[in-house]
Amino acid sequence: QINKKKLPLMDTVISAVNCTYPKADEKEIEFVFDYAKELETCMVMQDKRWLGEAIINVLDNAVKYSPEHSKITIRLQKRTGFVRIEIEDQGIGIPQSEYHKIFQRFYRGTAPEVREKSGTGIGLYLSRQIIEQHGGTITVASGKVRKGSTFLIQLPENGLS
Protein backbone atom coordinates (compact mmCIF):
# COMPACT_ATOMS: atom_id res chain seq x y z
CA GLN A 1 0.00 0.00 0.00
CA ILE A 2 1.32 3.41 -1.03
CA ASN A 3 1.14 6.11 1.65
CA LYS A 4 2.29 9.40 0.11
CA LYS A 5 3.60 12.38 2.04
CA LYS A 6 5.30 15.56 0.90
CA LEU A 7 8.99 14.73 1.35
CA PRO A 8 12.34 15.82 -0.13
CA LEU A 9 13.01 13.91 -3.35
CA MET A 10 16.77 14.24 -2.88
CA ASP A 11 16.60 12.32 0.43
CA THR A 12 14.89 9.42 -1.32
CA VAL A 13 17.42 9.39 -4.16
CA ILE A 14 20.40 9.54 -1.77
CA SER A 15 18.95 6.72 0.37
CA ALA A 16 18.57 4.59 -2.77
CA VAL A 17 22.17 5.30 -3.80
CA ASN A 18 23.37 4.43 -0.29
CA CYS A 19 21.58 1.06 -0.50
CA THR A 20 23.26 0.32 -3.83
CA TYR A 21 26.69 1.69 -2.93
CA PRO A 22 28.25 -1.51 -1.50
CA LYS A 23 27.73 -3.41 -4.78
CA ALA A 24 29.00 -0.43 -6.78
CA ASP A 25 32.03 -0.08 -4.53
CA GLU A 26 32.99 -3.74 -5.13
CA LYS A 27 33.20 -2.94 -8.85
CA GLU A 28 34.75 0.51 -8.22
CA ILE A 29 31.81 2.18 -9.93
CA GLU A 30 31.49 5.89 -9.20
CA PHE A 31 28.15 7.62 -8.65
CA VAL A 32 28.05 11.12 -10.14
CA PHE A 33 25.27 13.57 -9.21
CA ASP A 34 24.15 16.35 -11.54
CA TYR A 35 21.39 18.68 -10.35
CA ALA A 36 20.48 22.31 -9.80
CA LYS A 37 20.81 23.56 -6.21
CA GLU A 38 17.05 24.17 -6.03
CA LEU A 39 16.49 20.41 -6.27
CA GLU A 40 18.19 19.83 -2.91
CA THR A 41 15.00 21.03 -1.24
CA CYS A 42 12.49 19.88 -3.87
CA MET A 43 9.46 18.32 -2.14
CA VAL A 44 7.42 15.63 -3.90
CA MET A 45 4.34 13.70 -2.84
CA GLN A 46 5.79 10.23 -2.35
CA ASP A 47 5.93 7.09 -0.31
CA LYS A 48 9.65 7.23 0.44
CA ARG A 49 9.97 3.50 1.02
CA TRP A 50 8.27 2.47 -2.20
CA LEU A 51 9.65 5.20 -4.45
CA GLY A 52 13.09 4.45 -3.01
CA GLU A 53 12.61 0.78 -3.87
CA ALA A 54 11.74 1.70 -7.47
CA ILE A 55 14.94 3.75 -7.76
CA ILE A 56 17.01 1.01 -6.09
CA ASN A 57 15.80 -1.51 -8.69
CA VAL A 58 17.03 0.74 -11.51
CA LEU A 59 20.34 1.45 -9.76
CA ASP A 60 20.88 -2.26 -9.00
CA ASN A 61 20.57 -3.05 -12.71
CA ALA A 62 22.88 -0.18 -13.61
CA VAL A 63 25.52 -1.57 -11.26
CA LYS A 64 24.95 -5.18 -12.32
CA TYR A 65 25.40 -4.51 -16.05
CA SER A 66 28.11 -1.83 -15.87
CA PRO A 67 31.80 -2.70 -16.15
CA GLU A 68 34.27 -2.18 -13.34
CA HIS A 69 35.73 1.33 -12.99
CA SER A 70 32.78 2.95 -14.78
CA LYS A 71 30.35 5.58 -13.59
CA ILE A 72 26.62 5.95 -13.08
CA THR A 73 25.28 9.48 -13.46
CA ILE A 74 22.15 10.54 -11.59
CA ARG A 75 20.57 13.75 -12.87
CA LEU A 76 17.64 15.55 -11.30
CA GLN A 77 15.85 18.16 -13.38
CA LYS A 78 12.83 20.31 -12.72
CA ARG A 79 10.65 20.77 -15.78
CA THR A 80 7.29 22.39 -16.38
CA GLY A 81 4.75 20.07 -14.79
CA PHE A 82 7.16 17.43 -13.51
CA VAL A 83 10.53 16.55 -12.02
CA ARG A 84 12.77 14.09 -13.81
CA ILE A 85 15.34 11.64 -12.46
CA GLU A 86 17.77 10.31 -15.06
CA ILE A 87 19.94 7.31 -14.25
CA GLU A 88 22.63 6.84 -16.89
CA ASP A 89 25.04 3.92 -16.86
CA GLN A 90 27.94 2.75 -19.01
CA GLY A 91 26.75 -0.83 -19.19
CA ILE A 92 25.84 -3.26 -21.94
CA GLY A 93 22.92 -1.21 -23.24
CA ILE A 94 19.48 -2.42 -24.24
CA PRO A 95 18.49 -3.14 -27.83
CA GLN A 96 15.69 -0.84 -28.99
CA SER A 97 13.62 -3.92 -29.87
CA GLU A 98 13.44 -4.72 -26.13
CA TYR A 99 12.42 -1.27 -24.85
CA HIS A 100 8.74 -2.20 -24.65
CA LYS A 101 9.50 -5.58 -23.02
CA ILE A 102 11.86 -4.72 -20.17
CA PHE A 103 9.08 -3.43 -17.91
CA GLN A 104 7.06 -6.64 -18.30
CA ARG A 105 6.95 -9.00 -15.35
CA PHE A 106 9.64 -11.70 -15.44
CA TYR A 107 11.16 -10.40 -18.68
CA ARG A 108 14.93 -10.68 -18.91
CA GLY A 109 16.92 -9.39 -21.84
CA THR A 110 18.18 -11.66 -24.57
CA ALA A 111 21.86 -10.65 -24.49
CA PRO A 112 24.25 -13.32 -23.16
CA GLU A 113 25.53 -10.81 -20.57
CA VAL A 114 22.01 -10.58 -19.16
CA ARG A 115 21.49 -14.33 -19.05
CA GLU A 116 24.74 -14.98 -17.19
CA LYS A 117 23.74 -12.64 -14.32
CA SER A 118 21.31 -13.70 -11.63
CA GLY A 119 17.89 -12.08 -11.59
CA THR A 120 14.17 -12.74 -11.81
CA GLY A 121 13.09 -10.07 -14.27
CA ILE A 122 10.72 -8.49 -11.76
CA GLY A 123 12.67 -5.40 -10.64
CA LEU A 124 11.85 -3.05 -13.52
CA TYR A 125 8.27 -4.31 -13.58
CA LEU A 126 7.88 -3.37 -9.91
CA SER A 127 9.60 -0.03 -10.50
CA ARG A 128 7.10 0.82 -13.22
CA GLN A 129 4.14 -0.19 -11.03
CA ILE A 130 5.39 1.92 -8.10
CA ILE A 131 6.21 4.96 -10.24
CA GLU A 132 2.82 4.79 -11.96
CA GLN A 133 1.16 4.69 -8.52
CA HIS A 134 2.98 7.96 -7.87
CA GLY A 135 1.43 9.39 -11.05
CA GLY A 136 4.72 9.15 -12.92
CA THR A 137 6.35 7.32 -15.79
CA ILE A 138 9.56 5.39 -16.38
CA THR A 139 11.12 4.93 -19.80
CA VAL A 140 14.47 3.86 -21.16
CA ALA A 141 16.76 5.26 -23.79
CA SER A 142 19.85 3.37 -24.78
CA GLY A 143 22.70 4.51 -26.90
CA LYS A 144 24.14 1.92 -29.15
CA VAL A 145 24.39 -1.61 -27.81
CA ARG A 146 27.27 -1.81 -25.32
CA LYS A 147 27.18 1.95 -24.79
CA GLY A 148 24.98 2.11 -21.71
CA SER A 149 21.39 2.98 -20.91
CA THR A 150 19.53 5.94 -19.47
CA PHE A 151 16.38 5.40 -17.45
CA LEU A 152 14.06 8.41 -17.18
CA ILE A 153 11.70 8.64 -14.21
CA GLN A 154 9.21 11.48 -14.35
CA LEU A 155 7.08 12.44 -11.37
CA PRO A 156 4.24 14.96 -11.51
CA GLU A 157 4.71 18.52 -10.38
CA ASN A 158 1.75 17.97 -8.03
CA GLY A 159 3.39 18.35 -4.66
CA LEU A 160 6.53 20.08 -5.90
CA SER A 161 7.78 23.13 -4.08
Please place each PLM-identified region on the residue numbering.
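Short helix-loop "hinge" at the ATP-lid/N-box region of the Bergerat-fold HATPase_c
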Residues: A62-V63
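Short conserved segment of the HATPase_c
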Residues: I94-F106
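Short conserved segments within the C-terminal catalytic ATPase subdomain
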Residues: K23-Y35
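Conserved micro-motifs of the catalytic ATP-binding
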Residues: Q1-K4, T41-Q46
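Conserved glycine-rich
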Residues: G136-T137
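Short alpha-helical Gxxx[C/S/T] motif in the catalytic ATP-binding
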Residues: G123, S127
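A conserved beta-strand-to-alpha-helix junction within the catalytic ATP-binding
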Residues: N3-N18, E30-V32
